Amino acid sequence: MTEAIYETVITTQDATGQAHVAPMGVRYRPLADGSPGVVLMPFKPSVTHDNIVATGHAVLNIVSDTRVFATCVTGRRDAAVLQLLPLAPEGQVAGQRLACALRHLQLRLATRQDDAQRPLLHLAVLAQAEHAPFIGLNRAQAAVVEGAVLVSRLHLLPADKICREMDYLQIAIDKTAAAEELQAWGWLRAAVAAHLQSATPSAAQSATPSPSPAQRQPPAPNPQKDVA
């Protein structure tokens, strides 16, 4: 049976205490003893993987502010969006959580199955806390998450497919987005535009996403992508 994958944000820190934030799909899978667990399978090279192996700890953040996903995959690393808070004094792991998290889970590495491309990290859930209610599903938020996944794969996809996908996702943005989603979407559109402009002139001209009245274009993002 296929396990559901949930889009979350993982915060880790290295041995010196330097924090790292990365969107990551996770599976909720109990440990061998039946206690709650979380599975991560980051692609190498991965700062998240290296930090977890070095410290044995991670924090899983559940967010509804999709700007977190967009700012990470576009390389913007917006400090206001990625604001971190220390864990409560009784925290069981070394780390920080996102200030915008609706909920966070403190994780400790239980087992690791190494792999040349995607190692499997099985982490135990030590503690969790809720900070704000989940108020419901929103189509624009889902579209931003899908757009973020698309942007993370721009180097793998043909230009026409990128534009078709963005145009389809634009429908949900136009109909259901609020200010946060519009800002996140603008960052993603700017990243796509920059990618297409760097392609051959003919490809960029023939594969341009349709303009939208809801689109808010900020300056082009830093092309340097972050490593999960």
Question: Model regions: which residues?
Answer:
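A short, well-structured catalytic beta-strand-centered motif of the EAL phosphodiesterase domain
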Residues: M24-R27
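Intrinsically disordered, low-complexity repeat/linker tracts enriched for polar/charged residues
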Residues: Q197, P201, Q205, P209-Q217, ...
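Periplasm/extracytoplasmic soluble domains of Gram-negative envelope assemblies
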Residues: G34-S35
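Active-site-proximal mixed secondary-structure blocks
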Residues: M1-A19, L31, V47-S202, Q224-A228
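Short, well-ordered beta-strand segments in soluble/periplasmic domains
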Residues: V38-P42
